[in-house]
Regions:
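Aromatic-lined ligand-binding clefts that engage carbohydrates, nucleic acids, or primary amines
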Residues: 33
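Short glycine/proline-enriched coil/turn segments at helix->beta-strand junctions
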Residues: 22-25, 40-44
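Metal-dependent nuclease catalytic core centered on acidic motifs
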Residues: 1-30, 49-209
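Conserved catalytic cores of phosphodiester-cleaving nucleases, focusing on short active-site segments
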Residues: 37, 44-50
Length: 209
């Protein structure tokens, strides 16, 4: 089993979600290095990364400590108030399942937009130095926030020189939606809560490593 929030968890989650929303043939891809997801049969490589987020790591710890232990929301909130005082996210229940988000309400995205743009530029440098090349080279970014809009993604893309950009596609994972930039336009793909739970559980139990 993979620990939620670990590097391999993110890689497995990215692969599982891409199989569902983009290319089912990626089921044969392997989790390797440089890039993280490699499908040699179809010549597709996907590098996976995530923006740093202390609240996200705290949410993962809360989920590990409190979820799947027959605790109701009041019990969980009491534990959070006692042991995770700086947590600023939200915990909720829907159709008998409990969910946790590391953020809530309106946020100033300027810092987050800067962070994502910087990460993309760093990945471009690394790609040009020592990454294996495929016919299709993609980048998958966990943004850890459901409030990003198409406009936010467009702003991020505007900070990139596409004339020397090595990736064919960029997937921006924004929790309940994934934005796909194909060098021409940004498409929004909505992900249901049921699928979010499925992706998570499949990633936790991913064993083809």
């Amino acid at each position: 089993m993979l620990e939620v929030g670990s590097k391999k968890f993110f890689e497995a989650y990215a692969k599982i979600s891409l199989i569902d929303i983009y290319n089912s043939e990626l089921k044969n891809a392997e989790l390797l290095e440089c890039p993280d997801i490699q499908d040699c049969t179809n010549s597709i490589g996907v590098e996976v990364t995530a923006i740093p987020n202390k609240q996200r790591f705290m949410a993962a710890k809360i989920a590990k400590k409190c979820f799947n232990k027959e605790l109701d929301l009041d019990d969980i909130n009491a534990i959070v108030s006692e042991d995770f005082k700086s947590f600023n996210g939200v915990i909720f229940e829907w159709e008998g399942r409990k969910y946790i988000s590391s953020s809530k309400g309106y946020e100033d995205f300027s810092d987050k937009i800067d962070s994502i743009a910087e990460i993309i530029l760093k990945k471009v440098d690394k790609f040009n130095n020592n990454y294996k090349r495929f016919n299709e080279n993609d980048l998958y970014i966990f943004c850890h926030n459901a409030n990003f809009t198409v406009n936010d993604i467009t702003i991020i893309i505007g900070r990139i020189d596409l004339n020397v950009f090595p990736y064919n596609k960029v997937f921006f994972n924004c929790i309940d939606k994934i934005y796909l930039f194909d060098l021409k336009q940004v498409n929004q793909i909505n992900i249901s809560l049921e699928k979010l739970e499925k992706y998570k559980q499949c990633a936790i139990n991913y064993s083809d490593i």
